[in-house]
């Protein structure tokens, strides 16, 4: 077993490294030189019908609603896991916010630095790299090969093995990816009831959208006395969230935290390109006109959303799931009181806007070197893939809790290990199935679940399911995905390797400086030409070294 003491240098590095979604490198690790002795002792054979106990750590989710008497520590899902697969899960700790949020990441950083890890947990790409170098996690190659079912192995290879490769170092599987689809577009969401009220046409260009935002702010269609044009929250950089600016930036052909073609056969960093400066110039102009909440830089998504729910903002950018969030203000007392519609990203020029996307996984399930039963994590993964794709009636407990019926409680979020379909044909299937009410078209459990919710809304059984229609119905968000695929409008990050040495050392500082100057520019606290100084500083403070390392990787992995 490894030496229990980490060097002071490593501890300081782990404590200092930022792990929140705005500072952790979103590129994905692939083969790289691992630390030595990464293979832990082989797990002891577990006698059949013996329950094994393993620990993990959790982050609370605001969309999870517990049945009476249940908690994160004691609930129907944990009980079912112990009964069905003989794995008793305990939580070492539970904190507020998602597992990419600051509270969870700060707690996990300290757990890593003090060598106080649970048996298994979810790590970011940067954390995965650090944990390998610190010799704190197990090589899962043999355990995965032995305990993963054929279905699990096939499920995680549907992308040709890219995501599994990203968790593999020198041929050793160090982290099992929380797989997902790379097709995660951003949309611009607009209050269409306000468009009708003010006799405004639907937007076709970025210029149209800005005019709509100006009119919403000036005319105050919500009658509140104070309206803004665009909802923005302090985590504006989040590419798969809502109330951010990534979709807006993409409309200027600017991309956040991506390595993109430099036109010379290499890669360059997106944050420092001229397109970013032009997008920031436009945002600064919007801020000066009063189109953006002056307090956005200190408001999280929920706080900024109060302005949306209170009829003060009618435009925002967000992922396809955004209507589930908007429903909090859009549906009241069994009636839809706010009408929203998604639009594909709008462009500032004649070239269609691409929506940026990544590899499809930003999280890895890892097992502590001290864990006695690494196979438990694989068993949990096997179980999830079964119950999330083709559950029996009894296994619906994993999705709905004891009732085994849809009630909006989101019990599936209690599963401690997850993996999602790397492909996604919801856009090709759901809008047509819902429009024609043809269940025979449905191919996956997710599609059947979404279809059922949409039907409840259409049949008048449950108006609160309005949000599912806006996601999956005709004209809903997913109906745009086939067009985006067909016209190659997903802009992929071309670097998906392990964080380079300079990224590990300098990325946090560089991203902090970026966020500081970008927010100042937007809020008109710094002139737009401060962007040029930021670019110079970025290069001097490690950006040039990072670019060199990325291009060395790119040359070897094209």
PLM regions: where:
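Sec-dependent N-terminal signal peptides of Gram-positive bacterial secreted proteins and lipoproteins
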Residues: 1-24
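Conserved N-terminal structural module of periplasmic/extracytoplasmic solute-binding proteins
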Residues: 19-208, 257-258, 267-269, 392-394, ...
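Conserved small-residue motifs centered on glycine
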Residues: 42, 387-516, 525
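Extracellular/periplasmic catalytic domains that process cell-envelope and extracellular macromolecules
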Residues: 47-49, 113-115, 131-133, 166-170, ...
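Extracytoplasmic/periplasmic substrate-binding proteins
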Residues: 235-258, 281-448
